[in-house]
């Protein structure tokens, strides 16, 4: 109880500091306040780009000021292993280092790892003492640090350092652990044991996303495991791994947290789902009685462009302005009252494939994390974007004075010109016929057969569901029936080309 009072006083002080104006004046009044969600988080990907301890501490200071209380560290991925594990020294001697400083260069040039200390080796890792220092620093600001150790996928760096843990035992060939191999579980449990000794967090994040499972159908050990356990497909094989790791974590008084793919093949009994592919996975978890943390890419992925792409450094794509982050409501209106409490919180994520420097990372985080913090703290009825925007402009100036590198909100261009108002033309509402084998790709249907004549232009990203995609046949064949002979003065269309990294 005393600890809760101290924590609440800490948040009260943050509110007080935020209300003081430039003249050191404070408005007269009474503040009655409480957070909407228990979990208010930010994820930092330190694998694709390694950030040193001082940088992470600096972000903790800001996150605490805006009343976030969870820092999720994405410690492992193909681009580099970032935490010291005594039992497996090759993870930091080799898997923590790569040939190129930027993810894009590394990805496009063979994706090779390097020995620590070799020429041109880029990377790094946190020693155990570093982790203890970070955890204590965060705890003093009422932030819990949650570690993520990826499994069964996103593990190329591990499987190149220890290829015997893959299905084919070949370095540089596999991304998924061999779930049929007992040595895999020995490795994972040993790693998690050392991780739990460093992180007192309630949750241990195990990833669980984007498993290709390509080798599992032909791997003798995986097939033997499936037969022995009565598993009907590779999704259930992944679920077997998740269930088994959960039992291990629960045995150490910890809870399992994973991306929404952990639903595939059956959700582990006590798991919490972090829903990133929309909110559907989170809702599925909640309806089955599990907690969910909402972090859909559409609203919470800060690696997307936050302004007109041609005015910004290269990003992974998308368009996520401050206003859209602020508009996010993690609890759908359709959710029953008794289930609302299972929406445990929200989180923003900064994956760093296209984040080459600490300064760039801060530009992508701020001020969008302020919007996320308000989503996490304030009830929808208490929110007003116009008021928030004024406060965000002030916050940007304060952040700059404190040595941060936020996005210059005052220079924001906004959405693509014309995207927010309807276009009037002769083809609006007319019938569209697509040629044989030249229809749009179902995954990018936009408004379906009427999308091209609905009078609505696309914005900066195809993610706005206004752009119709043609990717299968690399061609399009469209007929628009104007119903009568019509004099035309202009024929045109907008096109967007999206290429891979």
What are these model-derived regions, one by one?
Residues 46, 75, 350, 436, ...:
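Residues that line or immediately flank small-molecule/substrate-binding pockets and catalytic motifs
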Residues 76, 209, 351, 374, ...:
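Flexible loop residues that form catalytic
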Residues 133, 142, 153, 185-203, ...:
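Substrate-binding groove of N-acetylhexosamine-processing glycoside hydrolases
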């Amino acid at each position: 109880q005393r600890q809760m009072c101290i924590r609440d006083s800490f948040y009260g002080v943050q509110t007080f500091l935020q209300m003081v104006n430039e003249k050191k004046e404070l408005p007269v009044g009474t503040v009655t306040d409480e957070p909407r969600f228990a979990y208010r988080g930010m994820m930092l990907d330190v694998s694709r780009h390694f950030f040193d301890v001082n940088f992470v501490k600096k972000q903790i200071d800001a996150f605490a000021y805006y009343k976030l209380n969870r820092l999720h560290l994405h410690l492992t991925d193909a681009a580099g292993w970032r935490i010291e594990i005594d039992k497996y020294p090759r993870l930091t001697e080799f898997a923590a280092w790569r040939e190129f400083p930027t993810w894009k260069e590394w990805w496009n040039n063979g994706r090779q790892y390097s020995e620590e200390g070799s020429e041109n080796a880029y990377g790094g890792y946190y020693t155990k003492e570093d982790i203890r220092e970070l955890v204590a620093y965060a705890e003093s600001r009422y932030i819990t640090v949650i570690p993520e150790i990826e499994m069964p996928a996103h593990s190329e760096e591990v499987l190149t350092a220890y290829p015997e843990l893959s299905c084919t035992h070949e370095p540089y060939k596999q991304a998924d652990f061999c779930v049929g191999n007992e040595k895999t579980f020995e490795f994972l449990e040993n790693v998690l044991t050392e991780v739990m000794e460093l992180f007192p967090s309630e949750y241990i994040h195990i990833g669980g996303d984007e498993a290709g499972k390509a080798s599992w159908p032909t791997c003798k050990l995986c097939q033997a495991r499936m037969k022995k356990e009565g598993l009907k497909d590779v999704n259930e094989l992944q679920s077997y791994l998740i269930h088994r790791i959960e039992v291990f974590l629960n045995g150490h008084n910890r809870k399992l947290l994973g991306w929404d793919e952990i639903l595939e093949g059956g959700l582990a009994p006590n798991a919490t789902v972090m829903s990133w592919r929309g909110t559907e996975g989170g809702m599925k978890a909640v309806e089955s009685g599990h907690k969910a943390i909402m972090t859909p890419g559409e609203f919470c992925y800060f690696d997307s462009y936050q302004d007109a792409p041609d005015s910004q450094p290269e990003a992974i794509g998308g368009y996520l302005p401050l206003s859209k982050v602020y508009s996010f409501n993690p609890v759908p209106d359709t959710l029953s009252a008794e289930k609302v409490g299972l929406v445990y919180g929200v989180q923003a994520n900064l994956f760093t494939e296209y984040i080459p420097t600490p300064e760039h990372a801060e530009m992508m985080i701020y001020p969008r994390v302020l919007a996320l913090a308000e989503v996490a703290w304030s009830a929808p009825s208490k929110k007003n974007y116009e008021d928030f925007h004024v406060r965000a402009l002030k916050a940007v100036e304060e952040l700059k004075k404190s040595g941060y590198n936020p996005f210059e909100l005052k220079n924001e261009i906004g959405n693509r010109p014309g995207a927010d108002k309807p276009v009037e033309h002769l083809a609006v509402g007319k019938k569209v016929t697509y040629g044989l084998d030249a229809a749009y790709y179902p995954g990018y249907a936009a408004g379906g057969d009427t999308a091209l004549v609905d009078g609505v232009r696309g914005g900066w990203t195809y993610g706005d569901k206004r752009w119709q995609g043609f990717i299968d046949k690399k061609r399009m064949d469209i007929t628009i029936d104007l119903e009568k002979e019509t004099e035309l003065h202009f024929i045109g269309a907008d096109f967007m080309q999206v290429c891979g990294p």
